[in-house]
Amino acid sequence: MKKTALLITALFGASLANAHNVWLEPVKDVKGQYVVKFGHEETETYPQSKLKAVRLLDAKGQLQNATVNFKEGEAHFAAPDADIAFIRFDNGVWSKLPSGKYVEKTKQQAPEAVLSVNPIKFGKAILHWDAQANKSHNMDYELVPQSEPKAGQPLDILVLVKGKPVQGIKVGLGEDHPFNLTNEKGIAQFTPKAGYNKVWAEFDEPVKDNPDYTKRSVEYMLTFDAK
């Protein structure tokens, strides 16, 4: 079920806006076609302006921007030759008022707010397993599987921020599920199931003297198929 952004704002506020993620799904019965999904427990439509980038990586490690067709509140694109797709999504600024209500306004627009947060979402979809799948690709945030996944067997996942391993990052099925923390080498284990898998991670990005928000939350979703 899909809900409009207006309904989400009225009913759920920023707590769920923060918990939402973006990920890629294949279009049913259309080979090489994909759609960018957004949501938490249910998928939701989103304004095109919030989708900041969809980039495709080929077998040679070359990146290019996808040609996106936005329809029915979701982004669609073709990627017949891509090995990996990277997504960046900015969910705006949400401010908590003294009443406890969240509104989609900046700190400047709601100066009485006690908290203003900018939720950023990243998605990485591994479409084909080859040498590129186990490499990093110079992204600000990235989850890198250290081997091809096998259903039911623990998989080491390297977590990088600006190319460097980071310790203490939550990695799991999602915010509402159990998670593992990355170790001193930036590695956390995840046990995939047969079929389609989502691997979630959460980061905190420091904010100083920003006129629009006091906090930036970063959530990441890695997706792949396992046999």
Regions found by a protein language model. Give the residues of each.
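Short amphipathic beta-strand segments in non-cytosolic proteins
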Residues: R55-L63, I169-F179
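Short, ordered, surface-exposed loop/turn motifs in non-cytosolic proteins
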Residues: P47-L51, G163-L173
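N-terminal signal peptide c-region/cleavage motif recognized by signal peptidases
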Residues: A14-L16
